[in-house]
């Protein structure tokens, strides 16, 4: 066993090349074992073991700086830099982040979780090094689809002119989360097919020196390659051909399925906990496919995450030309959706809440100023969604709801969601975003939802009319509002329950109507409070006698949190909200 004796890169440097091959096998076995229990990025890490071992073997981290794009491929790096217990000891599995984290190790230089940033960050480190007159290697590790993002192109454009040491490792595994899309990847294919010799070379055209490695999973070949580029005095791209999922046959054969996985059974590859009932992702894909069949101008759009709205490989094939994967390029997705709408098509862009912030300028400039009727489906907007600091899904309400011309809708159940989706696709007056419920598919509420929301613009649904206190439950939290109202009945209070439906405007008529028989308005939203929906209500009532109690999530970066504990810390449990209401009323 070699891995048990590796506590730093220095320990690894004592091994022979043959011993390093055995070390790689041990690391891969440990990765598969941990990921089968803990879940995480399977394929990307299994494919990067040899390259990471070779990089640490040849280079001198942390003096030499490694910047991993997204940093979801950094597990082997962590194993070699004093954190192997988090991959070999089940009691320590939760001790490290799934991404690089400077608080864990001096070998990690940035907290990274979104894509296409590594070259930009590395070029900054290289420039600072040059300004300070220092000497060390700066390495950006990018690939697994990340080259399709616009910032990657911007970073390469700048890095090519640095005129000093800068090594860009392109991990070419022929995949993103799903298959790669974009003209760049045709050039990568050409370079693979010609062993890096093709005269048409994107990286050389950008101004980089270039070196190709045909087998990036051969540790000896990778050591030779890193030895050639170490201490180089100009920018160079090291293009390595790797196998995503290397060493685990199910991950090799099912690359999209094993990009990231919940805990799985190693012998079969099956999830240990079967997928639950049909979610909003599958519901959305099936509904859009039916619309596409009837209307060839309906088009689904993804920025490298087709599963966000249920477009599995077979559904993408059924959609054909009516489905577009932009690569991991949210800016392109929003801008193109705007132009598709302008041209008479009916685009629907599905995106996770955490990634919509990557396209904020396009939302404002390309979409909303032009007032083009594209539809954006925002998934997983909730404290209960992704719980690491780089993927928080808490900020979409302030970001989206405050852009002029945008209509941001918050459905409360399956039927309301589908009526809003149908209206959004067919209407031609507004850009529309829909905050898709993130807490599982809620069934029918026995309500006749409108088929045309234009006459209903900003109108509340008064789900129950009571007195004393009105509880406004936004989207996910409408059910929470109902629960709190039921608890208040036990104290003799018949609370009004409101579904606001629209996050971009207020029903001032009904807000005025509440003044006559209510002394307290409570807002509940599953997102950050600052700049959110509740503040709109509080500002409306201003210095009047109406009390307003806003409940949501405090503004902070939180990492690897327990969802239940965070709801409690923000006083968002039914018992806490009920108690706070009673305290104010009394």
Which role fits each region the language model picked out?
Residues 1-79, 204, 215, 239:
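N-terminal amphipathic, basic-rich helices that act as targeting or association modules
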Residues 29-36, 95-111, 133-139, 312-324, ...:
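Glycine/charged-rich beta-loop-alpha catalytic/anionic-binding loops adjacent to active sites
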Residues 39-48, 67-72, 101-119, 142-146, ...:
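Active-site nucleophile and cofactor-binding loops and adjacent substrate-binding regions
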Residues 41-162, 298, 303, 312-313, ...:
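Cofactor-binding active-site loop characterized by glycine-rich and histidine/acidic residues
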Residues 86-96, 161-175, 368-380:
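A glycine-rich helix N-cap at a beta->alpha junction
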Residues 108-264, 270-277, 281-282, 286, ...:
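Glycine-rich ThDP/TPP pyrophosphate-binding loop and its adjacent helix/strand module
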Residues 248-357, 362-372, 473-475, 489:
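Non-catalytic terminal/interface segments that mediate subunit docking, oligomerization
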Residues 263, 271-274, 385-387, 407, ...:
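Peripheral docking tails and interdomain loops at the edges
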């Amino acid at each position: 066993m070699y891995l048990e004796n590796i506590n730093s890169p220095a320990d690894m440097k004592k091994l022979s090349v043959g011993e390093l091959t055995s070390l790689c096998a041990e690391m891969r076995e440990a990765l598969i074992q941990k990921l089968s229990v803990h879940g995480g990025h399977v394929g990307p890490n299994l494919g990067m073991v040899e390259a990471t071992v070779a990089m640490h073997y040849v280079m001198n981290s942390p003096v030499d700086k490694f910047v991993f794009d997204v940093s979801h491929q950094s597990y082997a790096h962590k194993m070699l830099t004093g954190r192997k217990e988090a991959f070999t000891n089940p009691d320590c599995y939760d001790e490290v982040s799934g991404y690089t984290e400077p608080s864990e190790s001096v070998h990690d230089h940035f907290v990274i979780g979104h894509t296409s940033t590594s070259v930009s960050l590395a070029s900054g480190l290289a420039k600072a090094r040059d300004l300070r007159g220092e000497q060390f290697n700066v390495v950006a590790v990018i690939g697994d689809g990340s080259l399709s993002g616009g910032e990657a192109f911007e970073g390469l454009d700048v890095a090519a002119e640095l005129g000093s040491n800068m090594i860009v490792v392109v991990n070419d595994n022929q995949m993103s989360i799903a298959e790669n899309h974009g003209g760049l990847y045709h050039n990568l294919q050409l370079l693979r097919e010609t062993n890096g010799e093709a005269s048409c070379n994107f990286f050389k055209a950008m101004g980089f020196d270039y070196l190709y490695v045909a087998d990036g999973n051969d540790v000896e070949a990778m050591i030779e390659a890193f030895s050639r580029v170490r201490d180089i005095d100009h920018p160079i791209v090291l293009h390595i051909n790797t196998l995503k999922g290397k060493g685990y046959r199910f991950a090799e054969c099912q690359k999209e399925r094993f990009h990231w996985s919940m805990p799985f059974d190693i012998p079969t590859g099956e999830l240990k906990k079967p997928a639950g009932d049909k979610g909003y992702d599958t519901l959305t894909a099936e509904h859009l496919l039916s619309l596409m069949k009837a209307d060839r101008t309906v088009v689904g759009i993804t920025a490298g995450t087709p599963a966000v709205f249920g477009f599995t490989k077979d559904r993408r094939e059924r959609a054909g030309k009516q489905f577009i994967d932009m690569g991991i390029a949210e800016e392109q997705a929003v801008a193109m959706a705007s132009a598709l709408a302008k041209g008479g098509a009916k685009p629907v862009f599905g995106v996770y809440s955490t990634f919509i912030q990557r396209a904020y300028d396009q939302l404002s400039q390309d979409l909303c100023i032009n007032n083009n009727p594209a539809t954006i489906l925002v998934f997983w907007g909730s404290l209960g969604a992704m719980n690491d600091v780089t993927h928080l899904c808490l900020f979409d309400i302030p970001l989206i709801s405050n852009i002029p011309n945008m209509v941001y809708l918050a459905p409360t159940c399956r039927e309301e969601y589908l009526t809003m989706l149908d209206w959004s696709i067919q209407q031609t007056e507004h850009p529309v975003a829909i905050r898709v419920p993130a807490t599982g598919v809620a069934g029918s509420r026995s309500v006749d939802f409108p088929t045309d929301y234009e006459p209903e613009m900003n109108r509340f649904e008064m789900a129950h009319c009571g007195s004393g206190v009105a509880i406004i439950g936004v989207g996910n939290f409408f059910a929470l509002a109902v629960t709190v109202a039921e608890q208040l009945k036990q104290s003799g209070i018949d609370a009004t329950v409101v579904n606001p439906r629209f996050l971009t405007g207020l029903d001032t008529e009904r807000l005025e109507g509440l003044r006559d028989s209510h002394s307290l308005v409570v807002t509940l939203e599953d997102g950050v409070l600052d700049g959110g929906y509740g503040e709109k209500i509080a500002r409306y009532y201003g210095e009047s006698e109406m009390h307003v109690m806003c409940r949501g999530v405090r503004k902070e970066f939180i990492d690897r949190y327990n969802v239940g504990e965070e709801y409690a810390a923000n006083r968002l449990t039914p018992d806490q909200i009920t108690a706070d209401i009673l305290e104010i009323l009394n």
